[in-house]
Curated annotation (Swiss-Prot):
Single GO cellular component term: cytoplasm
Physiological role: Acts as a transcriptional activator. Plays a role as a differentiation factor during neurogenesis. Required for the conversion of cells within the neural plate and ventral ectoderm into differentiated neurons. Promotes the differentiation of late-born retinal amacrine cells, but not early-born retinal ganglion cells. Its function is inhibited at early stages of retinal cells differentiation.
Record InterPro entries: bHLH_dom, bHLH_transcription_factors, HLH_DNA-bd_sf, NeuroD_DUF, TF_bHLH_NeuroD
Biological classification of the source: Eukaryota, Metazoa, Chordata, Craniata, Vertebrata
Protein name: Neurogenic differentiation factor 1
SMART domains xrefs: HLH
Alphabetic keyword roster: Activator, Cytoplasm, Developmental protein, Differentiation, DNA-binding, Neurogenesis, Nucleus, Phosphoprotein, Transcription, Transcription regulation
PANTHER family, A to Z: BASIC HELIX-LOOP-HELIX PROTEIN NEUROGENIN-RELATED, NEUROGENIC DIFFERENTIATION FACTOR 1
Region entry Disordered, spans: 1-96
Gene that produces this protein: neurod1
Chief location bin: cytoplasm
Length: 352
């Protein structure tokens, strides 16, 4: 701070004008400096903002270019291959191919062993069920059905404690089976399938009862359901209808009247059915010629031929016989048309 001295050496009072001028000069310089600095700062800020903005624009342009390139690549890929959804498939290498082959071979071996075991089990089951044939092999489903029926029949026997008759047992076995399997079961059990089929058993039973009632044991006029009754006298039904009983005759007793017929009889003249024969796996029933058909000839139509050949009587056992006087016999031309038709039918039955 400057002090002014006078001539006499006294300090004069400070003049306010100089100080104010100095302050003003200093303040004006400071303001100019500040303005310059602020201007420089403003310029720097403007430059930084411009640079940042330009950088963002450049980045956006670069990203846009990249997206366009990606879109173009995707379009090209879409044009070449269809777009696949889901996880991407891995590339097949040699190691993966080998692993796939080994895995497939193991799976095939497991399936083959499983089928072999199943076939062996079915073969052993076929030997247990009552329908075993070396020539004819049951299918898998038929084997299982027959085994189910067999188990059910055995369980019913154990539950009731009584042994059923053969016909009902076979009906239980053949329930739900096909006709070839039913025939095979009947053949193995020595039965005729027509005797135990549900739809035919009632008809057969009624037919048997009608036939047994029309054939009494005593002498009777010769009658047959399918042939006219010739006036040739009387014959004994025990001789005409005598057949060889089979091992399954006891199973067919419900179809016959035990009070009137003591042996297995047949209502028709076709002869008894023999046990089924297996020809290439197919069981068939054939008619057996009766003993009277094999050993005797029916000679009531032509007694003159019997006398000339010297044959003995028709039946050797006692009982009413067919005795016709020779004098009353007319020639063959003298018979009526009805008698000729009837004799032809009888001749065909006893001589075929």
């Amino acid at each position: 701070m400057t002090k002014s001295y006078g001539e006499n050496g006294l300090i004069l009072a400070e003049t306010p004008g100089c100080r104010g001028w100095v302050d003003e000069c200093l303040s004006s310089q400071d303001e100019n400096d500040l303005e310059k600095k602020e201007g420089e700062l403003m310029k720097e800020d403007d430059e930084d903002s411009l640079n940042h903005h330009n950088g963002e624009e450049n980045e956006e342009e670069d990203e846009g270019d990249e997206e366009e390139e990606d879109d173009e690549d995707d379009d090209e890929d879409d044009d070449q291959k269809p777009k696949r959804r889901g996880p991407k498939k891995k590339k097949m290498t040699k190691a993966r191919v080998e692993r796939f082959k080994v895995r497939r071979m193991k799976a095939n071996a497991r399936e083959r062993n499983r089928m072999h075991g199943l076939n062996d089990a079915l073969d052993s089951l076929r030997k247990v069920v009552p329908c075993y044939s070396k020539t004819q092999k049951l299918s898998k489903i038929e084997t299982l059905r027959l085994a189910k029926n067999y188990i059910w029949a055995l369980s019913e026997i154990l539950r009731s404690g009584k042994s059923p008759d053969l016909v009902s047992f076979v009906q239980t076995l053949c329930k739900g089976l096909s006709q070839p399997t039913t025939n095979l079961v009947a053949g193995c059990l020595q039965l005729n399938p027509r005797t135990f089929l549900p739809e035919q058993s009632q008809d057969i039973q009624s037919h048997m009862q009608t036939a047994s009632s029309s054939f009494p044991l005593q002498g009777y006029p010769y009658q047959s359901p399918g042939l006219p009754s010739p006036p040739y006298g009387t014959m004994d039904s025990s001789h005409v209808f005598h057949v060889k009983p089979h091992s399954y005759g006891a199973a067919l007793e419900p179809f016959f009247d035990s009070s009137t017929v003591t042996e297995c009889t047949s209502p028709s003249f076709d002869g008894p059915l023999s046990p089924p024969l297996s020809v290439n796996g197919n069981f068939t029933f054939k008619h057996e010629h009766s003993e009277y058909d094999k050993n005797y000839t029916f000679t009531m139509h032509y007694p003159a031929a019997t006398i000339s050949q010297g044959h003995g009587p028709l039946f050797s056992t006692g009982g009413p016989r067919c005795e016709i006087p020779i004098d009353t016999i007319m020639s063959y031309d003298g018979h009526s048309h009805h008698e000729r038709v009837m004799s032809a039918q009888l001749n065909a039955i006893f001589h075929d």
